[in-house]
Amino acid sequence: LIDTLAYNTYINAFNANLVVNESYLDSATVRENVVSLARNIGYVPRSKTAATATIRLGDINVGTTNDSTTKFLKLRAGLVCVGNSENTTYRFSIPDDVTSTRVRDIGGTSFAQFDNPITVHEGTFLSRTYRVDTSKKQRYIIDSPGIDSSTLRVFVSSIADTGLGRNYRMIDNILNIDKNSEIFLAQEVQDEKYEILFGDGFFGRKLENQSVITARYIVTDGETGNGASNFSFQGSFTKSDGTLFTPSDTVNVTTVTNASNGADVEDLSSIKYFAPRLYSAQYRAVTPRDYEAIIQTIFPRTESVAVIGGEELDPPQFGK
């Protein structure tokens, strides 16, 4: 009996020690706990980052030139092309529609031209809708882990709106926000999923009852998508009247830059390092530590940052 009680006391003490460790940012080891503690001081960990490539589309034959010829072609948001890297095929998508530069007549035949390079993101384009019920306490959680939060687009449609509705913009602080601002915030929750948060009527527009929320985003493989090239077209177009258009010829895709800059979700050591520093900086760039934290948020793909103040030079250069 004494051995059993001693063992029970040991187990309870061990569990209590683990619980206490998970209560502090420095000692926590479970990702959900680290993310939750960082959230308390306003830090949102970096999501997965999709590898991006730059491509050009060749001229697209839209048929004989006449009065009914489309004014433009629109490359629809979603899958655009597939590329290969190390014998693996990757899907590349765009989060927003891209409109052709012009439709040009060449010898009685019209061709849609996309003059500007198009940036494509490695991953699968997905969409999720929610209906607002103000009588319930709702949470708008995106079920898919592994999203690139920079590709997240949120639209809110009220009863009076048509189509997807109004495009809300994502923010990371409440500076210059009023009660009419159409904004949302995104925060990581359990299992590397993201939750969308809206305004309360004081900071940001409050959602109306029975509004429809549409979230569109790209789920990516992160770093493994780097290096993909040899793209082949898989996208779809719409004409100026909104109808689907299927090219009669193969759409030529020219690679401008291979896929690069893909990265995995921010790891625990990075969260523990930058969360308190960004909190102390409060988005102000005054001390070297402030710059170190803020630069990482502006350029999230930065591997390392070294900041030296002028006062540390020999001779010192104050104010630099």
Regions found by a protein language model. Give the residues of each.
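Signature of Asx- and small-polar-rich beta-strand/turn repeats characteristic
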Residues: 1-320
